[in-house]
Amino acid sequence: MAGSLSEIKDKILSTEKTSKITSAMQMVSSAKLVKSEQAARDFQVYASKIRQITTNLLKSDLVSGSDNPMLASRPVKKTGYIVITSDKGLVGGYNSKILKAMMDTITDYHTENDDYAIISIGSVGSDFFKARGMNVSFELRGLEDQPSFDQVGKIIAQAVEMYKNELFDELYVCYNHHVNSLTSQVRMQQMLPIKELDADEASEDRVITGFELEPNREVILEQLLPQYTESLIYGAIIDAKTAEHAAGMTAMQTATDNAKNVINDLTIQYNRARQAAITQEITEIVAGANALE
């Protein structure tokens, strides 16, 4: 019985240590989430303005008939996917949702590796795709908790350049959209060619009229459209990082709660075993005393 009590006590101490670790990790993820949510709000100021400028310009007569490749649809022979995952685990179902969505998409729409190209952001996704022999053109590992544009700008620009050079004919970003601390949604968002423009961004009183573009519209579009697309992709990365921190916080909170439940169950077992041991000792003492009479 003494051995059993000792084993239960060791399990309680071990679980308490685990609970302290997961609780600390929960607090770290919570702090990262607050920073990421603020970064997302700050970025939206810039993103909203460039969306408004681009939408107004494209809905005006100033650029009608442009043959800019970022606006023109072409027969789709190959599709590019930017897939955003985390660099490590302990984030619940964050990665599994994205990877499942990508595998379903590839199974449904592509029969050969040459039909698609993956640009992977995050070690989990890179390792997953490479282990299955899938077509990973570029990858970025070790993304910061609050990634700057300088860190991701090169791979974003590379994706846009690959589209412009017709290495693929459409570009999507697959990521987890942050809804709140408990919820995220998988998004498969088309970035190129530029098709869907938010009508709310171009109200009648904001549409550009009576302006001239210098030196000419094609030069303006050549500068503006990549910047517009890159801002959307960067926004998706910030959004995904926010969802990752929320998932990490929730996962560690769940782990902490589970550890506390285990501790409670073990404590009950310990008390019962201790009570049984004491009862047995009393019984043995009484039996011994009776034997001496």
UniProtKB/Swiss-Prot annotation:
Leader sequence segment: none
This protein's record includes keyword Nucleotide-binding: no
SUPFAM superfamilies documented for this protein: ATP synthase (F1-ATPase), gamma subunit
Entry keywords, A to Z: ATP synthesis, Cell membrane, CF(1), Hydrogen ion transport, Ion transport, Membrane, Transport
Free-text function comment from the UniProt entry: Produces ATP from ADP in the presence of a proton gradient across the membrane. The gamma chain is believed to be important in regulating ATPase activity and the flow of protons through the CF(0) complex.
Organism: Streptococcus agalactiae serotype III (strain NEM316)
Subcellular location: Cell membrane
Membrane topology: Peripheral membrane protein
GO cellular component assignments: plasma membrane; proton-transporting ATP synthase complex
Listed name of the protein: ATP synthase gamma chain
Entry's family note: Belongs to the ATPase gamma chain family.
Annotated TM spans: none
Gene Ontology MF term list: ATP binding; proton-transporting ATP synthase activity, rotational mechanism
NCBIfam families linked to this entry: ATPsyn_F1gamma, PRK05621.2-1
Subunit-structure text: F-type ATPases have 2 components, CF(1) - the catalytic core - and CF(0) - the membrane proton channel. CF(1) has five subunits: alpha(3), beta(3), gamma(1), delta(1), epsilon(1). CF(0) has three main subunits: a, b and c.
Biological process terms in GO annotation: proton motive force-driven plasma membrane ATP synthesis
Chief site of localization: membrane
